[in-house]
Amino acid sequence: MKQVVYTASPNSRQIHVWSLNVEGGLSLLQTVDVPGEVQPMVINPDGKHLYVGIRPQFSIVTYAIGKNGSLEQKSIAPLPGSPTHISTDRAGRFLFSASYSFNNLSVHPIDDQGNVKAPIQIVENLQAPHSANIDRENRQLLVPCLKEDHIRIFNMDNQGYLVESHADAITTETGAGPRHMAFHPKKQAIYCINELDSTVDVLRKWEKYRIVQSVDSLPADFSSVRWSADIHMTPDGRHLYTSERSESLISHFRVSEEGYHLTLAGHYLTETQPRGFAIDHSGHFLIASGQKSDHISVSRIDKFSGELTQLARYPVGKSPMWVTILAL
């Protein structure tokens, strides 16, 4: 399986495009100059387009992905606020942009050529929405609102329009600060990393979503300010990882067979201030970006234990924040 890694560095306005080999080595394919400070990225499910959010002219840039993973800019669409997180629905028909600082969420159609267009809906008065996450059925959008300690739930119709389901909203612990989410690849379990108390909430849906476990991601003797960031799961659903920026840690959880119980298994030092990381499609490698180190690092994931072993580090642009991986 050929894989390509994209890293976004906002302070140098660059995307670095890498080829990932089966041993975990990276080879630089392309350096792309972006028309703005590039932050969140997402790949269309068709595998043919990469979308990136930029500032200070808040926009979504559409890139065509070539056969070897290289990028070519196609179009730019406006955003109603600074993009914190972007995602698509599972059919690749709509893009969602959550804006933490502008307290809104926008919905954008994606045309038949893969271009993101101007928003068809803007949901206002959300308190610090930090991500937008479509469910496995492609029917509901889960939006963690950090300053509310709520995960808001929106029903999506066939035209991409959202209607909030207030009765389905999830309430976290006071001061938790829900941020990013990961979905089990085979089960119905969903996991949310809370930025401010560094817990992971495990969600299960019966008639509505419930938190069935909340577990601390940090060592018992952790004394720094808690500042968690990202969360990802291996493709086999056996291991879950989170990142913490104050002490630059990756935390590892073992996941129960049914998916609803996490066991903290270890902590690993990584790049300084790991704002974003990703796991490759084979589940063999974890790639972390260091917002304060201007490097990314590749670590091997032990298939059985989930333990991480760092393999190599690579310089990128300034303040790398996002890592996205494509299987060609």
From Swiss-Prot:
Keywords: Carbohydrate metabolism, Glucose metabolism, Hydrolase. InterPro entries: 6-phosphogluconolactonase_YbhE, Cycloisomerase_2, Lactonase_7-beta_prop, N2O_reductase_N, WD40/YVTN_repeat-like_dom_sf. It comes from the Bacteria. It catalyses: 6-phospho-D-glucono-1,5-lactone + H2O = 6-phospho-D-gluconate + H(+). Pathway: Carbohydrate degradation; pentose phosphate pathway; D-ribulose 5-phosphate from D-glucose 6-phosphate (oxidative stage): step 2/3. Coiled coil: none annotated. HAMAP family: 6P_gluconolactonase (MF_01605). Catalyzes the hydrolysis of 6-phosphogluconolactone to 6-phosphogluconate. This is 6-phosphogluconolactonase. It comes from Xenorhabdus nematophila (strain ATCC 19061 / DSM 3370 / CCUG 14189 / LMG 1036 / NCIMB 9965 / AN6).
